[in-house]
């Protein structure tokens, strides 16, 4: 089995040393699974689509392949509306579904709700959650796990959008709840 993760800097593990991002922590916890991390700092959802298409250009559908898609924060920070981000993510999921099973990751909160942008992120996440349920995709709710920890007073962010080591560890635990059941 392989789990291929596509996303932005949060998928890559920005702001922590290599090995401490959520994908690498999952990889270390599941030795029998092959992980690939295609997280790119600053990536837009259109960039994710481009990367996904390039990656999949020589691949056929594989029932033992799971493709995790998580992106959108950079688009929101650049002023994109929730419907635009959602529609692009649906397109990414459609492309991914041609190569394997789809897992949707819901982006973590924008800490401090910079200029009300967290509200846009919540709208995208809710639409994605509903979409994932209707398509039968697994959904990893990274938003809630970090939001709840933040509400309890835990320091889980290194900045406005990037988790710190504790935040990435919580994200890994949440992902493993899904990944270990595949």
Predicted regions and their residues:
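Generic structural signal for well-ordered alpha-helices
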Residues: 52, 89-93, 125
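Oxyanion-hole/transition-state-stabilizing segment in secreted/luminal serine hydrolases
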Residues: 16-19, 45-86, 110-111
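Helix C-cap/helix->beta junction micro-motif
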Residues: 30, 96-100, 135
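Serine-esterase "nucleophile elbow" of acetyl-processing enzymes
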Residues: 1-41, 45-46, 53-63
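Catalytic His-Asp segment of secreted/periplasmic serine-dependent ester chemistry enzymes
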Residues: 109, 113-182
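Active-site segments of SGNH/GDSL-like serine hydrolases
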Residues: 70-74, 93-123, 149
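Glycine-rich phosphate-binding loop signature in dinucleotide/nucleotide-binding domains
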Residues: 58-64, 98-100, 182
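Structural recognition of the beta-strand scaffold that forms the well-ordered cores
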Residues: 3-5, 35-39, 65-70, 101-106, ...
């Amino acid at each position: 089995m392989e789990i291929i993760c596509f996303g932005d800097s949060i998928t890559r593990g920005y702001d922590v040393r290599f090995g401490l991002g959520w994908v690498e922590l999952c990889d270390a916890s599941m030795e029998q699974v092959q992980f690939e991390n295609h997280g790119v700092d600053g990536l837009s959802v259109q960039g994710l689509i481009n990367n996904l298409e390039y990656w999949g250009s020589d691949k056929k559908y594989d029932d033992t392949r799971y493709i995790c898609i998580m992106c959108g924060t950079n688009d929101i920070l650049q002023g994109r509306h929730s419907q635009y981000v959602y529609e692009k993510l649906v397109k990414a999921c459609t492309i991914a579904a041609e190569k394997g099973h789809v897992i949707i990751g819901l982006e973590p909160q924008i800490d401090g709700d910079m200029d009300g942008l967290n509200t846009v992120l919540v709208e995208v996440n809710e639409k994605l959650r509903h979409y994932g349920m209707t398509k039968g995709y697994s959904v990893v709710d990274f938003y809630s796990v970090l939001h709840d920890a933040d509400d309890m007073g835990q320091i889980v962010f290194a900045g406005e959008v990037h988790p710190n080591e504790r935040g990435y560890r919580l994200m890994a635990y949440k992902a493993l709840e899904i990944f270990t059941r595949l």
